Amino acid sequence: MSGFVFYIVEDEQLKAAAKACKNALLCYSNYHFAREGGYFEPSAEANPFLHTWSLGVEEQFYFLFPLVAVLAYGRGWLKARYLGGFVLVGLAISCFMTFQYPIRAFFALESRAWELGAGAWLAVAVARGTLPGWLSHRAVAATSLVLLLLSVVLLRNGDLVPAPLAALAVLGAVLFIGGRAGGSGSRLHGIFASVPLRFLGRISYSLYLVHWPLIVFVRSWRGELTPAIAAGLAVGGAHMLWAMLESLPARQAQLARRVWDKRGRA
């Protein structure tokens, strides 16, 4: 992927792309882009590694949170109510940073950790059986979808992101997933379990990896894209990446099980 990116980038942008690539490999690209300027700056939009900023946030969280969770578990602190407190404190910090240091707030772990922490709260609540019963009410699914749609409609070039606007998306996702985990039989959950949406869910990680480099490449070659063409290219590229690379370990494991079963029957 990196070699392909360096092929498509203009000479004057090559240095910026190389620096972003290095920081992405170090799981630090979010802070790199925070130093370089805003997400919506023209120079940033031409960088094929721009999308790696959120991977940096995730990787930093996934490295630090398990360490904290192990320590908390040993002291009996790994409980949903404590994680809920962490999310609320993180949201308050995020609101402060959004208004005082908007560029850093957009990219930084300290202003984004509460979003991932909300998912951790949900996982612990489900595992410990402390999920609120009202989450399984069918009206919760409709409310969650409204919140998710509002978070998209109200987004304007990063205004009030990550807080308080991102709280709509986070709360909507928690309500939707929590409702399904709580046994809700909402029709909305059935729709989202349909084959086309499950397909998008299956390739979602590959979709995130390929969408931005593909868009940068086609823009540099053919100019601006319509949303439909951009989406089609991204989904097609993501499916290829998923089929050739991401699903390979699962296919190998399945093949190994078949070989083992045949030997067991022999």
Regions found by a protein language model. Name each.
Residues 1-258:
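Membrane-interface helix/loop caps of multi-pass membrane proteins
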Residues 258-266:
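Internal/C-terminal transmembrane anchor helices
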